[in-house]
Amino acid sequence: MASLIYRQLLYNSYSVDLSDEITNIGAEKKENVTVQLGQFAQSQYAPVSWGSGETLSGNVEEQPLDGPYTPDSSNLPSNYWYLVNPSNDGVVFSVTDNSTFWMFTYLVLPNTAQTNVTVNVMNETVNISIDNSGSTYRFVDYIKTSSTQAYGSRNYLNTAHRLQAYRRDGDGNISNYWGADTQGDLRVGTYSHPVPNAVINLNADFSVIPDSQQEICTEYIRGGLPAMQTTTYVTPISYTIRSQRIVRPNEDIVISKASLWKEVQYNRDIVIRFVFANNIIKAGGLGYKWSEISYKANNYQYTYMRDGVEVVAHTIVSVNGVSVYNYNTGPLPTDFMIRNYDVLKESSFVYIDYWDDSQAFRNMVYVRSLSAELNQVRCVGGHSSFALPVGSWPVMQGGSVILTFDGVTLSTQFTDFVSLNSLRFRFRCAVSEPPFRVTGTRISNLYGFPAANPMGDQQYYEASGRFSLISLVPSNDDYQTPIANSVTVRQDLERQLDEMRKEFNELSANIALSQLIDLALLPLDMFSMFSGIQSTVEAAKTFATSVMKKFRKSDLAKSVNSLTDAITDAASSISRSSTLRSANSAVSVWTDISDIVDSTDNVVAATATAAAKKFRVKEFTTEFDGVSFDDISAAVVKTKMNKFNVVDEEILPRIITEASEKFIPNRAYRLIDGEKVYEVTTEGKSFAYLTETFEEVVFDAERFAELVTVSLVISAIIDFKTIKNLNDNYGITREQALNMLRSDPKVLRSFINQNNPIIKNRIEQLILQCRI
């Protein structure tokens, strides 16, 4: 039978992965280790070769071509060429001083007949005439010198490369290229109307070229831009070319960019707030002794404003290098004692892991040039009383440290759902006034910061400053770089699984019923099950091993191990009841072995449903000659697997395990008692009927409970409703009826070969339930 494959997967899964168990145990072992912090906090390699980063040099160089940049409207600096590369026709450049000079450039596409167009430029609606009968692009300059004039075309540039460049000289005059991009007709023209302080509007992507590199700009106009290469970091022009540029405290600067990756420098203002937490554990006895007062890691969430934007931030504070003190007044049970209490001293460090919801923390994996500046924080302890049963209460009070920023590294915070990038700020402690003491004891004038009440009267401590880092990130801003143990990889696997599930389910309509019954009767072994995927024996063995490891953790495998005898135990309890109504107390026995069935007033429904839920386990561990639901399930899996060309080794075990758990959820099982048949379903329905006439009779719960322990459990492939319908419409012999009740494969095959619509529809309904 095809379900033999499930037994083989189950029984072999406990002997194939001893080495994997050893590996898992080794991986789960936890050790306390000391990590020597290097330049990077994560031992991962970037997908490109990194150089030494920024190097100091006595020479100042300018890149001949910097960009491209997105469209911009600003008072661009003089003596630079701005090479525009528009992707659409329309206005690509405009400038005005709002008094004596208005100018804009319109890009006309090739083979454009003369027509009039309306454009919105510089807060004005303008009607112009355009014409370009040639096969090249045409940039046309439109100018007027009075607000009452109409725009007129002055000069144009014909180019095959859709490029035009603009420059403003020291006097404010605008220059651009005129003519055609052929060797003798390309020239630079200047409009002698100074606009030194006017805003220049560039409505297309543009690159920046120094005035000293005008020859290169001309070559670009003639021959087009070069292919994008991985550039060497020298001195990026960027917007640093603006002489009046003010460095913003919060900005993202693209340092270099290739096709898939770019380097971005993130500069951020930062406000770090943190809250110390502690453990105060009282020892047993009469109430005079404390076993531990210690610091513990604590998470704190807060919000603050950064450049008018609310930032949601998180911090985790922890300590290292604490000094442990103790105090004991004597050996008596009523002597006050603190076995251990933590104190931050000069040798101590405070670590604060910080992350927020800004863009900088989305791709903090491949990082260099990480630096930060933070102010000092002064922490002062409060009062903490020790409640003694009798006498005055000692009070620990005082203590102070000053936290001085000592460095920053990368760190990762792991939660149950995701791994988060973070920055770990390290603070060195320095003791300060006042000292701490415990009233009524000899503990006095000690310097440090005890863990008894580290927050004092403060809601939180706060450090302000800024950090900067250069991160290698994907060019696509919507993609987040996966980090160690990130959910991104699992999301990719889930996406593949969803696609495989969809394809797997869509194949149900292509299964021939006669082929399915024949396949269900074959004793499938592991090699024949997986050999259809790949042609090699080694691949089949690999797939079988992977499936075994996953299958041993399935619900079916767990049920076989722990619940095989559950039905027998419950049936024995019910069979001791004298009447049906007296079995109310025994219903709980059935309910105990089923975590699905709830208490119900209908005793028969409750017991029948509970039994049906467990019948699969008993049937699974028992051999019989009929067709079972698991035979059909395994046959469907095999049939669908044969239609796959290649299946991932990690996905296939998930698919087969899910199939064993989810295929055919609505099942019916029957027990035969001479001329009487008992049938129960997983939906809570129960039937009792005669084999001779299929007349329904009273369901005897006590007799049913007795049969559970001794009778063979049979999958009701053709359930009572279908058999009755078949008998009423076609008429069947007694022998056919008995064979149908026993799920005899020969009878099923004969009815299918006869194309009987009732039997065919029943099998098709079972196949449609084979979905994951």
UniProtKB/Swiss-Prot annotation:
Feature type site, description Probable cleavage: R245, I246
InterPro entries assigned: ConA-like_dom_sf, Rota_A_VP4, Rota_VP4_MID, Rota_VP4_MID_sf, VP4_concanavalin-like, VP4_helical
Sequence segments annotated as region (Spike body and stalk (antigen domain)): 247-478
Annotated site location: Cleavage: T232, Y233, R242, S243
Cross-referenced Gene3D superfamilies: 1.20.5.170, 2.60.120.200
Classification via Pfam families: Rota_VP4_MID, VP4_haemagglut, VP4_helical
Protein keywords: Capsid protein, Coiled coil, Hemagglutinin, Host cell membrane, Host cytoplasm, Host cytoskeleton, Host endoplasmic reticulum, Host membrane, Host-virus interaction, Membrane, Outer capsid protein, Viral attachment to host cell, Viral penetration into host cytoplasm, Viral penetration via permeabilization of host membrane, Virion, Virus entry into host cell
GO process terms (BP): permeabilization of host organelle membrane involved in viral entry into host cell; virion attachment to host cell
Sequence segments annotated as region (Spike head): 65-225
Coiled-coil region: 483-510
One GO cellular component, as annotated: membrane
Ranges for region Spike foot: 509-772
Region named Hydrophobic: 388-408
Extra remark beyond the main annotation: In group A rotaviruses, VP4 defines the P serotype. Some rotavirus strains are neuraminidase-sensitive and require sialic acid to attach to the cell surface. Some rotavirus strains are integrin-dependent. Some rotavirus strains depend on ganglioside for their entry into the host cell. Hsp70 also seems to be involved in the entry of some strains.
Family label: Belongs to the rotavirus VP4 family.
Stated name of the protein: Outer capsid protein VP4
Native source species: Rotavirus A (isolate RVA/Cow/Japan/KK3/1983/G10P8[11])
Lineage of origin: Viruses, Riboviria, Orthornavirae, Duplornaviricota, Resentoviricetes
